[in-house]
């Protein structure tokens, strides 16, 4: 199973280090020296972590395959994918899900389907679900129990209790 754990940002320095947007709860485990990542696009990898360090709140990685800033620049935007056989929802954590489990679920308000989950954006305060409506509009929904009280992976839906105006805030015809 493949799990998206990070996205490469801009180069840092001249020796090929890059900044990484961390998309995992366990960066110390995932980004340790020797870890091997598949990449998207596949032409960028695989990449093997040589060094991992934090500069303030930013993760800096050095890869064995990257030894200068020019090569590091070509990796900007590359997704880092961790391959594992042991990724499954932990039964003891009934309120934890992986992004791949949520994408494609119907988003319902009451019994009405208002869209589908198209992405999960990890943020410092709380994660945001990206709901794509039938009209193709994207709505960002805070992934908190008060707004998303029910997630039923087996049945293929999430239930929303959105605050007033959440689905209208970005509509072009709402003015």
From Swiss-Prot:
GO terms for cellular component: cytoplasm; ribosome. Residues 94-166 form the PRC barrel domain. GO terms for molecular function: ribosome binding. It comes from the Bacteria. Keywords: Chaperone, Cytoplasm, Ribosome biogenesis, rRNA processing. It is found in: Cytoplasm. NCBIfam families: 16S_RimM (TIGR02273). An accessory protein needed during the final step in the assembly of 30S ribosomal subunit, possibly for assembly of the head region. Essential for efficient processing of 16S rRNA. May be needed both before and after RbfA during the maturation of 16S rRNA. It has affinity for free ribosomal 30S subunits but not for 70S ribosomes. One of its GO terms (biological process) is rRNA processing. This is Ribosome maturation factor RimM. It holds the Pfam family RimM. It comes from Renibacterium salmoninarum (strain ATCC 33209 / DSM 20767 / JCM 11484 / NBRC 15589 / NCIMB 2235). InterPro entries: PRC_barrel-like_sf, PRC_RimM, RimM, RimM_N, RimM_N_sf, Transl_B-barrel_sf. Binds ribosomal protein uS19. The PRC barrel domain binds ribosomal protein uS19. Its main location: cytoplasm. Belongs to the RimM family. SUPFAM superfamilies: PRC-barrel domain, Translation proteins.
């Amino acid at each position: 199973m493949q799990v998206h754990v990070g996205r490469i940002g801009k180069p840092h320095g001249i020796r090929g280090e890059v900044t990484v947007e961390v998309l995992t709860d366990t960066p110390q485990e995932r980004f340790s020296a020797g870890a091997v990542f598949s990449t998207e696009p596949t032409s960028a990898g695989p990449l093997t972590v040589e060094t991992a360090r934090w500069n303030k709140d930013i993760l800096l990685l050095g890869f064995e395959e990257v030894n200068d800033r020019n090569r590091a620049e070509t990796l900007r935007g590359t997704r880092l994918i961790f391959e594992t056989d042991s990724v499954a929802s932990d039964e003891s954590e009934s309120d934890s899900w992986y992004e791949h489990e949520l994408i494609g679920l119907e988003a319902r308000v009451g019994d009405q389907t208002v869209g589908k989950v198209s992405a999960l954006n990890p943020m410092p305060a709380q994660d945001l679900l990206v709901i794509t409506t039938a009209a193709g509009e994207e709505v960002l929904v805070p992934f908190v129990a008060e707004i998303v009280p029910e997630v039923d992976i087996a049945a293929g839906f999430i239930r929303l209790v959105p605050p007033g105006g959440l689905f209208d805030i970005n509509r072009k015809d709402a003015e």
